[in-house]
């Protein structure tokens, strides 16, 4: 069942790029975007989502035949409904990002995640199999969309302009193609494994990727949704852009690094608790993706100023070069097995890091050495914490007690060293948390 969902997700994630990547990004990047711009992009997005759904509907039997999984025919057709539903929220997300109304985005995400988790677990316990996972994904999308429409004070107007659309499309198609190339290459390994091996191999590979990405993507979605609009506001002041980028680099690494290294140190314990011992073959892929996640922090942050200053042309040109190299690397790795295919992911991200740093050096005078130095402190603190967590993992305790001690000791070790060394990122995050608690108390 999970192998089937993994295959479905590949095709839907590719289709999602057309909706969530380019057009709404152009609204955030444009300083004086008005109602005409937002309404125009809304209708374009919805029209595109209908076309994409029809393509998925028509090609579903072909995909099912290619992977020899008959259930894919109906599953893809139902799962693809999230495309037109998503089209109703992407412009809303762009609007609240533009207005810096991030609380609304947070509550929409939390609401969808919690309710979809309940529905997914309930359906799984009732024996719905693959449909439980599809139900979870669809519920998440529908609830997110409903909450955004209920809370965001913008609705599309009865207006559309090809003149307004032209400059937005001119910028966004390059961003869209860049993200599409990235998504295709990120899923290239899954395509190959699903075709050359079997759905069980694909399930271990996909599940191993999913666990680290679950933490990373949620953090990235939150912080990047703040960072990109923030840089776009000051995109004509290079000094301000560099200052914001460096601060974001330090904060992101401070948050992501301990989670990634902690997951590596406690991986076996966590996998056994969450998925049972039969899923332990996914561990090598968990470790590989944790390494990739660490490398992705400077690579991802360094990409934001390139987008914000409007250089989507540079993004696309360099992405083509990077992905050609990645495809060649993956084709070679095919001859050495699934593990070799998985290793191409962190190697590709490392290439992204180097290329993005070269571009940033030219655009905002932020070089690779500065990027790595901004991440170094968090890496050292996280490494010390991971050693402590790994040591506890070798003790002869019951699995649940061991996991609890590993998590608590990891948090205490990381925050304790941060406090003793007067880490600036720790102080900043603590101050933000205290302000949030104060506002909550005032509200109550």
Where are these regions (language model features)?
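Alpha-helical transmembrane segments of multi-pass membrane transport and lipid-handling proteins
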Residues: 19, 43-68, 74-77, 118-122, ...
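Membrane-proximal transmembrane or re-entrant/amphipathic helices at the cytosolic face
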Residues: 358-361, 366-368, 375, 387-444
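Helix-loop interface residues and adjacent transmembrane-helix termini in multi-pass membrane transporters
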Residues: 35, 66-69, 99, 127, ...
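Helix-terminus/linker motif at the lipid-water interface of multi-pass membrane proteins
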Residues: 1, 64-66, 122-124, 183-214, ...
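Interhelical loop/hinge segments that connect adjacent transmembrane helices in multipass membrane
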Residues: 103, 146-191, 226-243, 360-376, ...
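Short runs within selected transmembrane alpha-helices of multi-pass transporters and secretion channels
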Residues: 8-28, 78-97, 108-120, 132-149, ...
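Interfacial/gating helices of multi-pass transporter permease domains
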Residues: 1-15, 73-74, 167-171, 175, ...
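Helix-loop junctions and terminal segments of transmembrane helices
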Residues: 17-35, 97-98, 208, 212-256, ...
């Amino acid at each position: 069942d999970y192998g089937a969902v993994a295959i479905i997700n590949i095709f839907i994630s590719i289709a999602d790029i057309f909706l969530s990547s380019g057009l709404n990004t152009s609204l955030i990047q444009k300083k004086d975007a008005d109602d005409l711009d937002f309404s125009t992009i809304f209708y374009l997005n919805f029209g595109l989502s209908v076309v994409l759904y029809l393509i998925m509907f028509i090609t579903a039997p072909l995909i099912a035949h290619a992977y020899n999984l008959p259930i894919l025919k109906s599953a893809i057709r139902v799962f693809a409904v999230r495309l037109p539903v998503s089209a109703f929220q992407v412009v809303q997300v762009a609007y609240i990002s533009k207005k810096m109304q991030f609380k609304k985005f947070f509550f929409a995400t939390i609401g969808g995640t919690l309710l979809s988790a309940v529905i997914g677990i309930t359906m799984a316990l009732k024996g719905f199999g693959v449909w439980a996972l599809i139900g979870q994904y669809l519920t998440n999308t529908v609830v997110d969309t409903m909450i955004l429409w209920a809370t965001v004070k913008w609705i599309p107007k009865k207006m559309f302009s090809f003149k307004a659309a032209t400059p937005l499309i001119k910028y966004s198609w390059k961003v869209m193609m860049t993200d599409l190339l990235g998504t295709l290459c990120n899923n290239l390994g899954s395509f190959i494994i699903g075709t050359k091996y079997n759905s069980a191999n694909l399930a271990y590979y996909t599940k191993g990727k999913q666990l680290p990405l679950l933490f990373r993507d949620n953090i990235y979605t939150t912080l990047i949704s703040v960072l990109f609009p923030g840089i776009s506001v000051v995109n004509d002041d290079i000094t301000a852009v560099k200052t914001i980028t460096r601060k974001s680099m330090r904060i992101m690494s401070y948050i992501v690094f301990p989670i990634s290294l902690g997951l590596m140190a406690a991986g076996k314990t966590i996998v056994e608790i969450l998925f049972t011992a039969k899923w332990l073959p996914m561990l090598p892929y968990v470790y590989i993706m944790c390494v990739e996640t660490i490398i992705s922090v400077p690579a991802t942050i360094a990409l934001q100023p390139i987008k914000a200053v409007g250089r989507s042309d540079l993004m696309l040109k360099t992405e083509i070069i990077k992905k050609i190299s990645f495809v060649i690397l993956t084709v070679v790795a095919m001859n050495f097995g699934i593990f070799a295919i998985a290793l191409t992911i962190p190697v590709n991200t490392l290439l992204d890091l180097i290329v993005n740093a070269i571009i940033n050096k030219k655009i905002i005078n932020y070089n690779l050495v500065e990027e790595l130095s901004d991440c170094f402190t968090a890496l050292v603190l996280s490494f010390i914490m991971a050693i402590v967590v790994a040591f506890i993992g070798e003790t002869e305790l019951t699995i649940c007690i061991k996991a609890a001690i590993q998590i608590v000791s990891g948090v205490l070790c990381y925050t304790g060293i941060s406090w003793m060394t007067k880490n600036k990122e720790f102080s900043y995050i603590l101050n933000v948390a205290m302000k949030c608690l104060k506002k909550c108390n005032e509200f109550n």
